Amino acid sequence: LEQKIDTNKGFLENLIKQQSSNDIAARGTDNNISVAEIAVPPDEPVSPRRVLSVGLALILSTMFGVGLALFLEYLDDTVRSTDEVENYLQLPALAAIPIIDSMAKRRLLLVGPGNEDGDHTKSELLIQSDPRSSLAEAYRQLRTSILLSTAGRAPKTLLVTSSLPSEGKTITTANTAVSLAQTGAKVLIVDADMRRPRIHTVFGMENGSGLSSLLSSPAKEEDVLELIKFDTSSNLYVMTSGPVPPNPAELIGSEQMTSLLKILQNNFTHVVIDSPPIASFTDGVLIASMVDGVILVVQAGRCSRQVLKRSRQLLTDIGARIFGVILNQAKLGAKENHYYYESYYHADHYNGSAEKNEI
């Protein structure tokens, strides 16, 4: 027992000595830590900064939207303005037919006022349905460009075509012919699209004997004139396509077609011809080699530049004279609006004094 007491006393003495050493060491060390300021909790979070984050998000989203729009425009291979048409094809833009955004306006212009019996068979003759509309002014501007396209005399034979189907060439052909007839000229419209004829539906006529009938065998002048119909409302002469033949290109390229055009030129002031798309069929290219000039209809945002370039090359290779391009369903920019500003204030001149004289 005494031995355990002595051992515990030894442990106690060692602990006392160690504590004394620690106290001496602590007193010898300088304490340079002090409280500078008592911490105060902030009124709002330090992070994230909401205003800064929203501002950065708006800037980044705007940059992304602009970049995406530029990228999509870079990928777009179509033409959408008269400037693009002229710069890429190196051809003059004769007119820009505006797109109708309002469905109410579209319905009014396409259907028109009709007659007393509510007949709307001429619904696609936009230049008649609303003579003061921007559409009618566009076609009057086109008429002026056509009449001034050749020095010395106005063209006798004119082909209106397009690169692809459904670009509006038939409606453009009909309205162009009507606008020429409004000057008092004797105008004939010929439906040479014997693959998908439409002129007879535009004028509400039956498509019985027509162009294909005359080209199937040699025809005399009196036979040709007998098949031509007259539309009193538009003061326009119409030759329908006739029955759809199995070989339209062969008929178009025949000697009968050349002879027929000579007969028509001798009897009419202007002959306006509607043909199939030239990038799809050879019919239009064959006709282009026989007429005084060609007008190419291009729907904005539809036909690729490569197809347009090919169409222009096809016409150039045969020596066709391209008067220019009509941009259909165009969104009007500054240059396109200039067309209508100019044509609007000259409309009375062409509808008044010019109508008294046959061109």
Regions picked out by a protein language model, each given a short descriptive name:
Residues S241-F281, A288:
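Phosphate-binding/switch loop-helix module in NTP-utilizing enzymes
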Residues L215-V244:
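Nucleotide-state-sensitive switch-loop elements of NTP-binding domains
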Residues L52-T176, A181-K186, M194-R198, V202-S209, ...:
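Short boundary/hinge segments that flank catalytic cores
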Residues H270, G293-L296, G324:
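Well-ordered beta-strand positions
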Residues V40-V54:
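Membrane-interface helix-start motif
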Residues G10, G28-D30, P155, I171, ...:
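Extracytoplasmic
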Residues S275-S280, V291-K309:
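Conserved Switch II/interswitch segment of TRAFAC-class P-loop GTPases
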Residues L1-D43, T82:
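Non-transmembrane alpha-helical coiled-coil
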